[in-house]
From Swiss-Prot:
Transmembrane segments: none annotated. The lineage of its organism: Archaea, Methanobacteriati, Methanobacteriota, Methanomada group, Methanococci. It comes from the Archaea. It comes from Methanocaldococcus jannaschii (strain ATCC 43067 / DSM 2661 / JAL-1 / JCM 10045 / NBRC 100440). It holds the Pfam family V4R. InterPro entries: NO_sig/Golgi_transp_ligand-bd (IPR024096), V4R (IPR004096). This is Uncharacterized protein MJ0855.
Length: 228
């Protein structure tokens, strides 16, 4: 099943590989048109790319998205009015219950004041790009590096591949309503793509997180698109 993140990844590939703007926009249009009947999926693509160059490109490539963007704004406005009229105190997405890592603080600060929901994709991409730049391409190197910067790592080489991180610094002493270790997930994805010599795009999803009360963080990796 195609999700918004997979579409965004394919759009990024088009952006990076198509040299001429006309060809780039046509390829993006053809891709987005495939999902024209799934408005909620396209809305999610718009939300996750908000504030980026890619966002502007896809609006140019596929003008019908402008109407969906208006719908998103109207929906957000209604939610805001409902919240204000209800007089409920606005809750933080993530709260701290003790000393947290600098990255955890920066992430929540950017979410609250600047990035909103976009923080998820941005920190995922940062982690992924960092791993790719480091050139980590073996499980042993991945475990060694993550032990220093994230936490204790156990890799279950099953299908799908599962990575368990204990005492993850990204979420230690954090409390949230959903998994929040986007940087860790992206980093794992980058390492695994290196291990496949970038033959596949790898998607990593955090299914358990200490921030929501789980005993450890669990990440599941899946190869989503073959590139060769």
């Amino acid at each position: 099943m195609t999700n918004a993140m997979k579409i965004i990844e394919m759009l990024r590939i088009i952006d990076n590989r198509a040299k001429f703007m006309g060809i780039k926009l046509t390829m993006m249009k053809n891709l987005l048109e495939k999902y024209k009947d799934n408005k909620e999926l396209l809305k999610e693509v718009l939300k996750l790319t908000e504030g980026t160059r890619l966002h502007e490109l896809i609006l140019e490539a596929y003008p019908p998205l402008e109407e969906l963007k208006k719908e998103i704004r109207e929906e957000e406005h209604k939610i805001k009015i409902t919240s204000e009229s209800g007089g409920e105190e606005k809750k933080e997405f993530c709260t701290f219950e003790g000393p947290v890592s600098l990255i955890a603080y920066i992430k929540e600060y950017l979410r609250k004041y600047y990035l909103g929901n976009n923080v998820k994709r941005i920190f995922y991409d940062i982690g992924k790009d960092y791993a790719i730049k480091l050139g980590i391409n073996t499980y042993d190197d991945m475990i060694t590096f993550m032990k220093k910067d994230f936490g204790e790592v156990v890799i279950e080489k099953s299908e799908p591949l599962t990575v368990v991180v204990k005492d993850n610094k990204e979420c230690k002493n954090c409390k949230a309503s959903e998994p929040i270790c986007y940087l860790t997930a992206g980093f794992i994805a980058g390492c695994l793509e290196n291990m496949t010599n970038k033959t596949y795009i790898v998607e990593v999803t955090e299914e358990k997180c200490q921030a929501v009360g789980d005993p450890y963080c669990t990440f599941v990796a899946k190869k989503s698109i073959r590139l060769d």
